[in-house]
Curated annotation (Swiss-Prot):
Protein name: Calcium/calmodulin-dependent serine/threonine-protein kinase 1
Its EC number(s): 2.7.11.17
Activity regulation statement: Activated by the binding of calmodulin-like protein 1 (CML1) in the presence of Ca(2+).
Residues at the catalytic site: 275
Gene: CAMK1
GO biological process: intracellular signal transduction
Top-tier EC class: transferase
UniProt cross-references to InterPro entries, sorted A to Z: CDPK_Ser/Thr_kinases (IPR050205), EF-hand-dom_pair (IPR011992), Kinase-like_dom_sf (IPR011009), Prot_kinase_dom (IPR000719), Protein_kinase_ATP_BS (IPR017441), Ser/Thr_kinase_AS (IPR008271)
Biased composition regions of type Low complexity, renumbered to the chain: 24-56
Length: 600
């Protein structure tokens, strides 16, 4: 792993030589063959800087990338400190034993990309011994006739990126970026599929101003060529360094609005990027106010709203805890965005260590520090925003659309919100819930703040209620199709929406929609959660609570005969009147099932 520390980024010059500790690319499942070495400009990165002479230092393990903010170049670096003198941070002490994922990731990466020599007993990844890999992609083979390659602007372990000029066609005379992936590097069936998927995602995602524009893909006998928009403004990382290592709050908001906007767009289409970091955001021009573009979809994948991915991918400093636990969705991108905004505001990484094991351990166990400068001088809203993204429980994290509604981002401005897929997931759960749980959620909805109601009202309007201010299943489908791209077909988002069949003959007003669209887990992530819960219980006690026997409660919750009901549920019912207790109310909000009941 690259040296990961919490000192100011202002004095940290990214170099390739700082790879001794590594900046490991944790990319088991979709490490793009042409992934450029950080911090060199990546796929569409044409900051127009000529390639530096010399060959980057090579390492025994071929999947290391340099740390974007190396530290050994200054005296106070943890790299130059003993373990004993390394400063503790938020109770985070060293040395740590390596966490369980660390050792396995290298082996998985090596096997995936064919860098480990197979032994005699190994079976080719294609599943059939001795079967040659098909490296034909069906792309056009007329690249040389249409484009003239120029200087190299970035190089990774599996390919390189060049500036190029279009010789004919609609783009004649225009400069473009070309990601060149040698077929010789595609030594496994998975590596080949990674390239196919990257092109498919780039070609199917279109229409967002903060997404790098894809033009075409070509191939010949030796290479695959991915032609994209040329971004000449450099990386977000370069801008951070140029500003002395961090952004002001106001400038950070401008950056975050763009990042959240494109993230929400991708997530609605069912695409998770899986490698969001400052190096993968480029500015379209050198102008200070130029648009920012997300690039490098080499690790991206399609994900259905109710599906969990299990490939360990990403860059170590930005990888979410659930990725290391091998069960994640689009929430993993929100964690990465949380790391980015932490860096923007203070110039330090929230999770740092001297080794890859330490980084993983920090991500899994440590809490980010808000005690060191400049955090005490930053607004409470900024700190709350970061905390709600860097919550280790992915269920409590904000979505990109919700983050755009956060008081720190929105301020007094009217922000145009995108449709949020979490609304569909929550509505499906609400419709299939018991009548008692729906009553509990309606009580909770009455405690929502103005900012929370603003978000829900915007989502309600995006779904498109009828003249009576009611929404139906058809409204849900129509709203989704208005925002769809070809990526939705691969991610099967529409198939998921079709499963919300129970609402087919129902119409929801805004009050019930608010109850249906509440995430109890996200509410729990608020500092004011206990106040919400107590107030909601008071509403529920007046309007929805009623006497209930244990057997009926078990039926309401769908608990099976294997659950010792009287032992488990006796504290959930008040003995004086037989109504739900506060504990029972809280359990009901979470939708308790047999799987969540502890065994006795």
């Amino acid at each position: 792993m690259g040296l990961c520390h919490g000192k100011s980024a202002a004095v940290l010059e990214p170099t390739v030589e700082e790879e001794e500790e590594g900046a490991t690319r944790v990319a088991e499942a979709a490490a793009a063959p042409a992934k450029p070495a950080s911090p060199a400009p990546s796929a569409a990165a044409a900051a127009a800087a000529p390639a530096k002479p010399g060959t980057p230092k090579q390492h025994k393990f071929p999947f290391y990338l340099p740390s974007p903010l190396p530290a050994s170049s200054y005296k106070g670096s943890p790299a130059n400190s003993s373990v004993a003198s390394t400063p503790a941070r938020g109770g985070f002490k060293r040395p740590f034993p390596p966490p369980s994922p660390a050792k396995h990731i290298r082996a998985l990466l090596a096997r995936r990309h064919g860098s480990v020599k197979p032994n005699e007993a190994s079976i080719p990844e294609s599943g059939e011994p001795g079967v040659a890999l098909d490296k034909g992609f069906g792309f056009s083979r007329h690249f040389a006739a249409k484009y003239e390659l120029g200087r190299e602007v970035g190089r990774g372990h599996f390919g390189y990126t060049c500036a190029a000029t279009c010789k004919k066609g609609e783009l004649k005379g225009d400069d473009v970026a070309v990601k060149v992936i040698p077929k010789a590097k595609m030594t496994t069936a998975i590596a080949i599929e990674d390239v196919r998927r990257e092109v498919r995602i780039l070609s199917s995602l279109a229409g967002h101003s903060n997404l790098v524009q894809f033009y075409d893909a070509y191939e010949d006998e030796e290479n695959v060529y991915i032609v994209m928009e040329l971004c000449k403004g450099g990386e977000l990382l370069d801008r951070i360094l140029a500003r002395g290592g961090k952004y002001s709050e106001e400038d950070a908001k401008v950056v975050m609005r763009q990042i959240l906007s494109v993230a929400s767009f991708c997530h609605l289409q069912g695409v998770v990027h899986r490698d969001l970091k400052p190096e993968n955001f480029l500015f379209s021009s050198k102008d200070e106010n130029s648009a920012m573009k997300v690039i490098d979809f080499g690790l991206s994948d399609f994900v259905k709203p109710d599906e969990r991915l299990n490939d360990i991918v990403g860059s170590a400093y930005y990888v979410a805890p659930e990725v290391l636990h091998r069960s994640y969705g689009t929430e993993a991108d929100m964690w990465s965005i949380g790391v980015i905004v932490y860096i923007l505001l203070c110039g330090s990484r929230p999770f740092w260590a001297r080794t890859e094991s330490g980084i993983f351990r920090a991500v899994l166990k440590a809490d980010p520090s808000f005690e060191e400068a400049p955090w005490p001088t930053l607004s409470a809203e900024a700190k709350d925003f970061v905390r709600r993204l860097l919550n280790k429980d992915y269920r409590k994290r904000m979505t990109a659309a919700q983050a755009l509604c956060h008081p720190w981002i929105r301020g007094t401005e009217e922000v145009k919100l995108p449709l949020d897929m979490i609304i569909y997931r929550l509505m499906r759960a609400y419709i299939s819930s018991s009548s008692l749980r729906r009553a509990a959620l309606r009580a909770l909805a009455k405690t929502l703040t103005t900012d929370q109601i603003y978000y829900l009202r915007e989502q309600f309007e995006l779904i498109g209620p009828n003249k009576s201010d009611l929404i139906t299943l058809q409204n849900l489908k129509t709203a989704l199709m208005k925002n769809s791209t070809n990526a939705m077909k691969d991610s099967r988002v529409v198939d998921f929406v079709n499963t919300i069949s129970n609402i087919q003959y129902r119409k929801l007003d805004f009050e019930e929609f608010s109850a249906a669209a509440i995430s109890v887990y996200q509410m729990e992530g608020l500092e004011t959660w206990e106040q919400h819960a107590r107030q909601a219980y008071e509403f529920f006690d007046k309007e929805g609570n009623r006497p209930i026997v244990i057997d009926e409660l078990a039926s309401e919750l769908g608990l099976g005969p294997s659950v010792p009901l009287h032992v488990v549920l006796q504290d959930w019912i008040r003995h004086p009147d037989g109504k739900l207790s506060f504990l029972g109310f809280m359990k009901l909000l979470h939708g308790v099932s047999s799987r969540t009941i502890p065994k006795t």
